[in-house]
Amino acid sequence: MKIALASPPYPASVDNALYQAEKLIQSAAPAGAEIICFPETYLPGYPGLGYDTGTTTQEMLESALTRVCKMAAANSIAVIMPMDWHEAGRILNVAQVVSAKGEWLGYQTKNQLDPTEDNKWTPGTDRNIFEVNGVKFGITICHEGFRYPESVRWAAMKGASIVFHPNCTGNNTAGKQLTEWGHQDNPYYEKAQLLRAMENTIYFAGVNYHFKYPDSASALIGPDGTCIAHQSYTEAGVLVAEINIDLASGSLAKRFKPALYNYG
């Protein structure tokens, strides 16, 4: 299976995000990608980065999701679209999953929030496994994938061949220009993603925005911890790479003995 990891610029608005999303989807589908993933809360854009993303209502978000479903169907490609979502008086940080036929398959919530996000979202409580064209996958969103490896181990133990990791690391105002993926002087993010793959013997796909000062690049990491491909630090775009589910054995995840660890 070929997958696509989108690295768009930070959106100016929901409409701008949808415009960019359609362009990247239209680029990924002809390259043979069967699923494309976007960065964390791409709709309307991760808050607190100095941009005014405006006020979004649930009606606006539902309309945006409908447009994403139409894009998926028009291009015959499944889509993982992270976004805000209003539910029962709460605002959730979710990743919506849409089939290549434009059918809504469900969403994964961000369950472990960064401490700085407690006033932005309500944490979710459920974890889910999704399946597209016979490939099972999980989703872990930003902080929880970096800091809580259990979120990835759970998916691997449930049979996921790959875990997608939409995230937001970096900014456009100040920072360090990265040049080499996984370099020892880079922020820890890429190294954490490498570990999530190899400690579970599955694929791990990090998906970040294109920033002037990124702290990580969108990348596909193999079950042995090898970075198979990554997006350029200096260019927006979409990365298309192939996975071989026969290599994603999940062997190390299957050896985990949860009974040895009592968190109560």
Could you tell me what each predicted segment is?
Residues 16-25, 146-153:
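Short, acidic/polar
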